[in-house]
Amino acid sequence: MPTIAIIGAGLMGRLIALSLNRQGYQVTLFDKDQKSGQQSAAYAAAGLLTPLGEAMHSPRNIVEMGFAALALWPKLLATLSGYNFFQQTGTLVVSHEQDIVDYTAQFFQKYLE
């Protein structure tokens, strides 16, 4: 099997490396930042997965892809060794009083059907 180099060890780079490694490829990850990933987008958002929270400002297909991805995380994490801190507890949407018309149960219900 050939060796594959992946430039960028953020979330996507790591997931691609994992997938290729499981297919038998030898993979090397390169990244300009620290190994801890403290400069990555996922670190900045604390790994927050909130497709419903993005619903006000994103096209419906983006929100639907977010829900599909959210369903995959427990399956992926179950295949990894070591500790992970994944909790799926729901979404709390907080808004200013003047925004209450935008954040109604009717708006969010269309994504939950």
Predicted features along the sequence, with ranges:
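Loop/helix-junction capping segments adjacent to catalytic residues or to phosphate/diphosphate-binding pockets
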Residues: R14, Q39, V101
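Flexible, glycine-rich phosphate/dinucleotide-binding loops
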Residues: G13, K35-S36, S58
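Short secondary-structure boundary/capping segments within folded domains
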Residues: S19, Q39-S40, Y83-F86
